[in-house]
């Protein structure tokens, strides 16, 4: 929790198009906002600012309720206020009334002292309100307007290395069978031994790396620039018994983290695939896991319900209770005993005691051993993922072991990682692991190495900490998937507006929402075709959803089969159809969005509408930098029409994108960023249109379609200097990850850089650069001591430069 002391200012231009202003904030103080108190009542007694700084302000001693040197005289507005120059230091104070401690007010008008921390001497105005018994602090003397020093605060918006890809996400076992000789993974026996049964949707079907390699033309034809493979490491071939038995075709039951699963091929075949892909300008990403291994460990008790730490804490080898979280991020960890340290006693079949590679994974004390996760509370990170062996990722051996494992795969040539089950691993692990792995990649000259995590939440507030607080490059944008599916089904465009309004959570000096991989469905939740069932015109709506994905910020991800119009009957196994001829009766009978059943033949058609549409969108994106990496500024969001501008910061030419999710064309009027410009169609069916002097245009957007219009000139420059105001306001309260925003002119292209420093300090720390006419960043103040006084500054640059 924190409180803000702030002041809004008009901007003053050193040159056209550049403006700045400052405000200040007080962390966790309990102080109130200047100018927000209720009307005050007159007070006849002496009102004194009493604290441990009084001797610095002219009093003979501290905590003197009767010292007039720190009195707060009554102002014309019947509040009590005075200005003091307070030296650097950590201070505490109250307001005493009547010259004694009989009546005194601290935090929230109570007994607790206000706290104040200054990095340097500062002129502060203290204001006490009789009616509310609350006190506000305002920093005086903040620099007004734009100055020469502000140039050093201006930074370009971030575009992260390796963050401009078109992904094709493929489940290797279900893509193409290029080498039938490896279908049983070099394992003798029947399907319960080797896991191969192409007639069962829960077993291996024969797809492999050789099949991927042989079909790179098909993948490249979609405009793909990066292939993301499901986990390819050696898996436990079969888990479960009887009707519950299934195979590790999906790749998430790993036993050997150093080898490609024999069902899929060899390490040498992977290297050959990577080399060929690279020659085509296509990267190869691995889906990786650190949360768990295959289900090798059993519990001697024969029970698997989660046991929480309050009921049964961990105990070291000497029997002392401890919390692994207390050691996370450190180089030490208590010695453990498999017989006595865990809620459940871990046991392993003697035939499998050495099955895991690297060898350290066979140590059963490196697992949580608490039973199956309940998907809430502590079990999210301590529980077994549906029986899979959940690693003790707080342990330095696990951290160091996985750093080495994945550094070795970087050496093989992998271009990036998609990190499975990231939310089920403690944050301290990611803070160390991501830094070590990324630093290693960079040291090998892999400057565009990119990692994104799977955090299964549709809320930027829950997703963004994995980007803000670690060196994870980005996260899968589950919030995007949810909002886009709703829009494609015909719901209001307001959902998209709300989605993109949270992009600022990802804005830091090194990260940005533009790096988020965006997707419409996947192998777990189900396909976009399935989500659209019952909405009518499902094929056109899928094309609309893909248009939105390729024309908005982020890195589009196409799940294999969506380009063929696969629908499926749900998530998991029901969304994992193969592109090569399927022997699964259910898959053969599944319908496609193109109006026919999948059947028992290969489906690598390049002339079907969805494949052609995606390829066209990829070509459009590749040929127009603004559509790939440009700023995205909302222009219209009402009913079924969503419109926005994309602007590349170098060319500064507006690309207006408008989409309509209704079954009839819609005509809308809105203000663009380029008054007087003529816009011509770059994509879609629309006649040229000219904006009036205020920038207004009227568009008729075709049913279930998108149009892209290109302006004939750069974005408009302001006619005259405007004004800028900055939030937080003086004395306003902030908590945790606090918003810091600037109010600038509407309907403009602008870049606004934010920074902070402790009041009294010299150096500024950047918070990030926001784009568009509603700039905002977030500042995590949770690490600042209570009472720290912080100064914020925003510098906004528009098209005038």
Placement of each model-derived feature along the sequence:
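Carbohydrate-interacting/catalytic domains
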Residues: 2-5, 25-29, 39-42, 46, ...
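Substrate-binding/active-site clefts of carbohydrate-active enzymes
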Residues: 159-166, 173-412, 433-444, 450-453, ...
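Active-site-proximal helices and loops of the catalytic beta/alpha 8
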Residues: 149, 274, 278, 291-292, ...
């Amino acid at each position: 929790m924190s409180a803000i002391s702030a002041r809004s200012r008009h901007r003053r231009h050193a040159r056209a198009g550049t403006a700045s202003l400052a405000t200040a904030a007080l962390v966790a103080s309990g102080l109130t906002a200047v100018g927000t108190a209720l009307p005050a009542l007159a007070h006849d007694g002496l009102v004194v600012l009493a604290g441990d700084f009084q001797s610095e302000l002219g009093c003979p001693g501290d905590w003197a309720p009767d010292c007039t040197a720190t009195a707060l005289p009554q102002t014309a507005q019947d509040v009590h206020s005075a200005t003091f120059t307070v030296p650097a230091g950590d201070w505490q104070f109250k307001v005493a009334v009547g010259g004694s401690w009989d009546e005194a007010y601290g935090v929230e008008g109570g007994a607790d002292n206000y706290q104040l921390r200054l990095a340097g001497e500062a002129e502060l105005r203290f204001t006490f309100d009789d009616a509310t018994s609350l006190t506000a602090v305002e920093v005086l003397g903040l620099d007004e307007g734009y100055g020469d020093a502000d140039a050093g605060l201006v930074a370009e918006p971030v575009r992260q290395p390796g963050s401009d890809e078109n992904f094709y996400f493929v489940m290797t076992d279900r893509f193409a069978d290029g080498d039938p000789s490896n279908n049983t993974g070099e394992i003798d026996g029947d399907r319960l031994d080797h896991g191969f049964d192409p007639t069962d949707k829960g077993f291996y079907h024969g797809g492999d790396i050789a099949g991927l390699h042989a079909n790179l033309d098909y993948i490249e034809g979609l405009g793909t620039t990066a292939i993301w493979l499901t986990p390819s490491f050696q898996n436990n071939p079969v888990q479960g018994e009887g009707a519950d038995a299934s195979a590790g075709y999906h790749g998430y039951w790993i036993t050997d983290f150093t080898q490609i699963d024999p069902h899929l091929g060899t390490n040498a075949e992977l290297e050959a695939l990577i080399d060929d892909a690279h020659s085509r300008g296509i990267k190869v990403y691995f889906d990786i896991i650190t949360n768990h291994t295959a289900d090798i460990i059993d519990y001697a008790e024969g029970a698997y319900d989660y046991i929480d730490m309050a009921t049964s804490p961990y105990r070291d080898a000497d029997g002392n209770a401890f919390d692994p979280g207390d050691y996370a991020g450190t180089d030490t960890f208590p010695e453990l005993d498999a017989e006595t340290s865990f809620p459940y006693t871990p046991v392993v079949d003697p035939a499998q005691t050495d099955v895991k590679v690297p060898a350290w994974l066979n140590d059963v004390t490196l697992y949580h051993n608490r039973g199956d996760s309940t998907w809430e509370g502590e079990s999210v990170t301590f529980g077994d993922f549906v029986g899979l062996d959940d690693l003790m990722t707080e342990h330095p051996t696990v951290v160091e072991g996985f750093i080495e494992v994945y550094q070795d795969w970087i050496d093989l040539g992998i271009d990036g990682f998609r990190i499975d089950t990231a939310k089920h691993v403690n944050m301290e692990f990611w803070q160390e692991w991501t830094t070590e792995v990324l630093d290693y990649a960079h040291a090998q000259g892999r400057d565009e190495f990119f990692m994104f995590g799977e955090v299964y939440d549709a809320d930027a507030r829950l997703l963004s900490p994995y980007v803000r607080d670690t060196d994870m490059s980005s996260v899968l944008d589950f919030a995007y998937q949810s909002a886009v599916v709703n829009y494609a089904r015909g719901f209001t465009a307001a959902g998209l507006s709300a989605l993109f309004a949270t992009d600022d959570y990802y804005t830091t000096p090194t990260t940005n929402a533009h790096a988020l991989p965006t997707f419409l469905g996947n192998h777990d939740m189900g396909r976009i075709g399935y989500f659209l069932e019952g909405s009518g015109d499902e094929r056109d709506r899928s094309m609309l959803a893909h248009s939105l994905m390729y024309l908005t910020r982020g890195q589009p991800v196409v799940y294999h089969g969506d380009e063929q119009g696969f629908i499926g009957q749900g998530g998991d196994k029901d969304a994992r159809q193969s592109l090569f001829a399927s022997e699964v009766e259910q898959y053969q009978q599944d319908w496609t969005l193109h109006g026919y059943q999948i059947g028992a033949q290969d489906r690598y058609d390049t002339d079907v509408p969805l494949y052609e549409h995606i390829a066209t969108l990829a070509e459009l994106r590749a040929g127009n930098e603004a559509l790939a990496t440009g700023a995205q500024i909302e222009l219209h969001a009402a009913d079924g029409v969503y419109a926005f501008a994309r602007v590349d910061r170098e060319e500064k030419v507006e690309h207006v994108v408008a989409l309509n999710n209704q079954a009839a064309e819609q005509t809308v009027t809105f203000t663009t960023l380029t008054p007087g410009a003529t816009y011509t169609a770059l994509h879609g069916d629309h006649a040229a249109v000219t904006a009036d002097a205020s920038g207004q245009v009227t568009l008729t957007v075709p049913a279930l379609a998108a149009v892209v219009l290109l302006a004939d000139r750069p974005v408009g420059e302001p006619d005259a200097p405007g004004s800028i105001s900055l939030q937080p306001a003086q004395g306003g309260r902030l908590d945790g990850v606090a918003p810091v925003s600037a109010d600038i002119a509407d309907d403009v292209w602008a870049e606004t850089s934010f920074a902070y420093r402790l009041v009294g300090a010299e150096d500024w720390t950047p918070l990030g650069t926001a784009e568009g006419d509603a700039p905002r960043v977030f500042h995590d103040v949770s690490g600042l001591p209570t009472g720290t006084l912080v100064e914020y500054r925003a510098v906004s640059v528009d098209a005038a430069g």
